[in-house]
Amino acid sequence: GCYADRIGMDGRVNFPGGARGLNPSEITIAELLKTQGYATGCFGKWHLGDDLSFMPLAQGFDEYAGIPYSNDMWSGKKRHPPLPYIKGNKAVAHISNGADQSLLCKAATDEAVDFIKRHKDSPFFLYVPHSYIHGPRFVRKELLDAAEGNITRAQIEEVDWSTGQILKALRDEGLAKKT
């Protein structure tokens, strides 16, 4: 393990454009597994520094899609730049409103399920760090309706749904007993 203080994480959060992040000299589990032939994917909130040297593709992941820092650090807060949605190392969209934010869990889930299907015949490591249940709280309307307007409950239920979708993909591909 690694205590946060050992690598300069002294209680301050990594803000967009900051100079701090996961030290590139640290060896991650993704880097170790890659040396053993694993495909590696990360889909969701990274929040370990948004400089390219800190991002998932520089830390042992073959694939990445998600947000580079917390979903409360977005232009809706006015003091932060637009929150990018990144694939690989490229921003392919920006989170500009609550409707965009409500799609983050589903997007990570869809990427994870696709990754499982594409790598079903070889070893893989899948890391899915959801931004839920973290404020600000946004969720897809159908989930909010099902949760009777309770947004915290809706976010918990969506993460539960996501886990179920990932487990279903493993079962569908005959991998459930090989994890």
Q: Regions from the language model: what does each represent?
A:
Residues 1-179:
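Formylglycine-dependent sulfatase
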